[in-house]
Amino acid sequence: MGPEALAQVVRPLAEIFRPEDYPDLLVGLETGDDAAIYRVSEELAIIFTTDFFTPVVDDPYEYGAISAVNAMSDVYAMGGDVVLALNICGFPRDMPPEIKAEILRGGAEKVADAGGVIAGGHTLDDDEPKYGLALIGFVHPDEFAAKVGARPGDVLFLTKRLGVGIITTAAKGGVAEENHMRGAVEQMLLLNRRAARLMKRVRCHAVTDITGFALIGHSLEMAQLSGVTLRFQIDRLPFLDGAREYAEEWLFPAGASCNKDAYESHVTFSSGIPDEVQMLLFTPETSGGLLICVDPKDADTLAALFSEQGQEYWIVGEAIEGPGAIEIL
């Protein structure tokens, strides 16, 4: 569902569940964050989220693993640890049992890698395969991360390359080179766990993960909630091998146009940035990285921590005073 349609569907819920009536709901509908957070004691809050989607790769094991990693990313974007998961499955009746088992095995092994446990789930018959997770994570109620809170001067860190969406679309069309698709798959299989743990050692004012609403959509949500403008340097943005090549061939998924229609009025591009590169920034990602707004005094510290622990990162821009918009220079 596109961002505008989603907002229209969810809007009535805010009138039923007013934030002032639920003081222990620390993060809920009002901010549209990556997950909900509910305080259960002075020392503990639970993070609750769910995500599932149709296959982005042909291999059933990798599909299950990627879907699980993508779902768990919301817990990491909130600064938490994965604890408990339930499978969400929609499978065709004629799908062989061994393929279903491989999908579930892929998801299960990634949840185990994250330190969590799968305790059950729900299945239904569906013409098109769907798989994902409902998740519970833990976080201290005073130490969670959120989209809101970015401040002018913050340094923007990104922990994964962009371009998964266009590469997987090219693969579905049979035109992606094998090494390009393999690079996208390997990135999608990477947990955001290490980056999330390291970012908590410095002053991070706002965090989100880059998934279906693309770099521009998710960063715009952060900018608007925080009351700042996020300025990105186009030459600092990292792209997977092949992404710009397929962009030049205009092999964009339909979701890119939906995102552009929803967000382009809030984005300013410098002249000279090619149309296809602009469109890449509206293109949905799967199992993307974290976008972290770091206090400028702590940017060098986080960069050093990431480097020491083998965590890839790119410093891609800064937060500035502004009306809640995006600038691409």
Predicted regions and their residues:
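Helix-biased detector of long, well-ordered alpha-helical tracts
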Residues: 1-329
